[in-house]
């Protein structure tokens, strides 16, 4: 099929991208740093659930969102990312952006960070790929610790605050279930409840992941804030899943295995995904 001149021109000025969620297959909190942040060691993995972002060049910046409760002002990471790209490159690039928000907020799935990374990628594409992926990764760390991860290929061991990214070979494709309770959790509040006086036997390197996979040091503090989360986890484990783990600072859990999700729970299925070099993420066909 041949494209018309108008279609070709329009494709140069607009782009539509998938913005994937992430889960933490393990998350170790090593300690609190002098700057007030926490030193982490975590295995990040992108999954096939996510948002959709549409970008179109225009003369002023605008952001709209399918979720009326999500702020679309300067506090939104999408606008922060666009303006960061403009300040770094000096380009007079303005965009009309629409966010089709499908991921729940305060779920530990990295939705906002993914949106920001996707925006940086889109800006670079619309500008003619004038900077490298490594530069985008470095810039992203200035506005969010989890943003650099999304410039890996989708599987990475992340350290520091999360911004130090060691890309890894893709893991085997795996079907999971994401279960999100009707409430979210504030990341700062979860970290505030960490108790370093209690000994923790979890290792903090990727090599030990095969020996003791799937742990999250933030679960205990999340359970202290919301005791019903522990009940939810135990219910999911008793339903037959091999693994049930909170992702990030919560409040969602990912489940692996052949269990059954209770009908009263809000849940959706997803799969591990990765991206190819010089391409952004896309969803995979459903696995059987």
From Swiss-Prot:
ATP binds at residues 104-114. It catalyses: 4-CDP-2-C-methyl-D-erythritol + ATP = 4-CDP-2-C-methyl-D-erythritol 2-phosphate + ADP + H(+). Its EC number is 2.7.1.148. One of its GO terms (biological process) is isopentenyl diphosphate biosynthetic process, methylerythritol 4-phosphate pathway. It is an enzyme of class 2 (transferase). One of its GO terms (molecular function) is ATP binding. Keywords: ATP-binding, Isoprene biosynthesis, Kinase, Nucleotide-binding, Transferase. Pathway: Isoprenoid biosynthesis; isopentenyl diphosphate biosynthesis via DXP pathway; isopentenyl diphosphate from 1-deoxy-D-xylulose 5-phosphate: step 3/6. SUPFAM superfamilies: GHMP Kinase, C-terminal domain, Ribosomal protein S5 domain 2-like. The active site is at residues 22, 146. Belongs to the GHMP kinase family. IspE subfamily. Catalyzes the phosphorylation of the position 2 hydroxy group of 4-diphosphocytidyl-2C-methyl-D-erythritol. This is 4-diphosphocytidyl-2-C-methyl-D-erythritol kinase. The gene is ispE.
């Amino acid at each position: 099929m041949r494209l018309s001149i108008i279609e070709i021109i329009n494709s140069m000025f607009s782009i539509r991208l998938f913005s994937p969620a992430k889960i933490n297959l393990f998350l170790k909190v090593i300690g609190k740093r002098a700057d007030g942040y926490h030193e982490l060691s975590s295995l990040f993995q992108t999954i096939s659930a996510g948002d959709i972002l549409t970008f179109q060049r225009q003369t002023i910046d605008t952001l709209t969102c399918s979720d009326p409760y999500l702020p679309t002002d300067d506090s939104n990471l999408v606008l922060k990312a666009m303006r960061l790209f403009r300040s770094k490159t000096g380009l007079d690039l303005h965009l009309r952006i629409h966010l089709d928000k499908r991921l729940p907020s305060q779920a530990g799935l990295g939705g906002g960070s993914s949106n920001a990374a996707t925006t940086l990628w889109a800006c670079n594409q619309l500008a003619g790929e004038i900077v490298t992926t490594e530069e985008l990764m470095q810039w992203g760390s200035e506005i969010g610790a989890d943003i650099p991860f999304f410039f890996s290929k989708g599987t990475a061991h992340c350290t520091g605050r999360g911004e130090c990214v060691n890309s890894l070979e893709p893991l085997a494709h795996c079907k999971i279930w994401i279960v999100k309770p009707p409430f979210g959790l504030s990341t700062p509040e979860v970290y505030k409840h960490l108790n370093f006086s209690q000994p923790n036997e979890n290792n903090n390197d990727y090599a030990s992941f095969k020996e003791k996979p799937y742990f999250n040091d933030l679960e205990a503090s999340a359970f202290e804030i919301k005791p019903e989360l522990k009940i939810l986890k135990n219910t999911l484990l008793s339903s037959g899943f091999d693994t049930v783990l909170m992702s990030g600072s919560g409040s969602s859990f990912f489940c692996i295995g052949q269990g059954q999700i209770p009908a009263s729970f809000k849940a959706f299925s997803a799969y591990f995904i990765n991206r190819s070099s010089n391409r952004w993420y896309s969803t995979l066909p459903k696995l059987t």
